[in-house]
Amino acid sequence: FGDCYVVTAYVPNSKGGLTRLPQRQRWDRDLTAYLQRLDAVKPVVFNGDLNVAHQPIDLANPKSNYNKTPGYSQAEIDGLSHMLQAGFIDSWRHQHPEDVCYSWWSMRSGARERNIGWRLDYQLVSHRLMDQVASTAILTDMHGSDHCPVELVLKA
């Protein structure tokens, strides 16, 4: 893309018992630094399964999962917060500040049917690119995986 970088990644899961949390924290630091280097050249759109629910609104059961379940530890939340403080915007949350919508559901116990999910999939954009974001969506009606697609439309 000529006007911006588009980066896609699967961010490593911290695993049960948060056994891989130190590796995850290193990944988050290195990824943020990489995105900042790109952003110094031209704006960035960063898409991916970030394996973190950033705010309590981003998962169905925040209290029972906090600091116990991979994807909702304070260290993982802080990793994404640092990325946002480094000049990136969670484009979906920016456009839908109060909406409860998930992009991932466990395959167990009919979680998707009961909408017991997590918002793990994000499209972060450089701050200076946010005014070019026309719309964002989480396509919950799309099936075929434990995740659903997320959509970002930039203005022409």
Model-predicted segments: where are they?
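Active-site regions of metal-assisted phosphoester/phosphodiester hydrolases
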Residues: 1-156
